[in-house]
Amino acid sequence: YKRQPIGKATFVIANNKLTVSGTPFAGHFNGQGYRIRNLKMVAANSEEGATYGLFGTLAPGAVIENFSFDTGCSFTVASTAGSSNGVVAGLVYDATVRDITSSAPMLFQGAAGNVRITMALIGTAFAETANVTIDNVNNNGTITAENRDNNTNGGATGYHIAGIAGFTTNDGASQQKVIISDCINYGDITSATGRTAGIVAAANRYTQLANCVNHGKQLNTCPKNDAGRLGNIACNMGAGSSMIGCSNYGDLTSTTGSRCGGITSAAGDATFENCANYGTILTDSPYRGVFWGYNNAVAQWTDCTAGGKVGTYNANAPVFDSYADAEQANYLGKQGANQSALTNIAYQIGNSGGGSAGGDAELRILFIGNSFTKDAVEHLPGILKAMGIDKVKMTHMYYGGRTVPEYNNGFATVNDYRCYECNPGAAGWTESMNKTIKEVA
């Protein structure tokens, strides 16, 4: 039985214009919290511009929400033509995807030559007359990407692999955005492609990332030296794009000298605020950094934390970079003639995030609530850090839209919260899953 996606359609993006043919899904699908089990999806498309996933293409105004894929599901991309593939949806066009978690492993075995194929939870997102919303979409599944025909392109025609979205962009005459918020990738990545990231492989145009976190480690073996452009949040940031409150905790290792950054490979002229890297970045390329790999544009970095480490891969015997205080901006990444603007950067080189183990706390605070609570407590770690208060441990159990009776009734059994923790002395929150309120209390 060959399964057809819901909303079967094909697409073409040319000169920043999108054309869709077929019958995209235009409705509202609410999974009501149900879990999809044992669904094995294989995208073996030979048709140029095919879209594949549980949903193929979402039409403007469509909404899909509130369901999950269990570990018995899987997603394999074996396309032989340029296509867009996502566990949830292949193409999201002026539509909304929210409150979805996948634990399905993803496997890329595509081979189409020098053309773009995407694989993520959402293959491609395109905004024209309305914003695209991708909110609270999370990946727990491992990601494996082969490179069967040696496509070594680290640019637009490379194979785009990511935890959340493969390729995001907008219409060339529009200022509508692709908004990706509160998304987490826990999936470790083993990839041989030139564009691979934890959250978005290519934030091409007018993409806004907010409060997204990558915990997945990436090992990349792109088969050509200096071909890959790798970042653990996004590989590149295009015109009109921004990143707010995003953090990377995953290590990024290139064995073949790809350009690597903990946050992004190429920052462009994007704005970054309250972002942080705590991962270890290893590549033999001179274009490496805890923030970006190489950039020759005036990006804006404000109130960001430079943690983790950076150095050479050196045949798996790492040699870490070391700079004097006056030169510590070199940890961030290589710059061309156009220099990025750096404001209030906290250098914590060697810090993998999370502060101490929490045993020295003299005060412990537990917050339970939704997005209003999250907004209220978001900056408390930085405030306490600035005040020199390092004896407070804070935990926030977050679930959007949950009512007070639901928190109470599921006190010891419900574990679908996002657990944000700030250990004593830490400057930010660390996210985890699968904990109950009783466990953290």
Regions found by a protein language model. Name each.
Residues K2-G359:
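Surface-exposed repetitive/solenoidal architectures
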Residues E362-R364:
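Residues that mark the start of a beta-strand
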Residues S371:
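Catalytic nucleophile serine of serine hydrolases
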Residues D375-A441:
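Conserved SGNH/GDSL esterase-like catalytic core that processes O-acyl groups on lipids
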Residues L366-I368:
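Conserved beta-strand elements of the Class I
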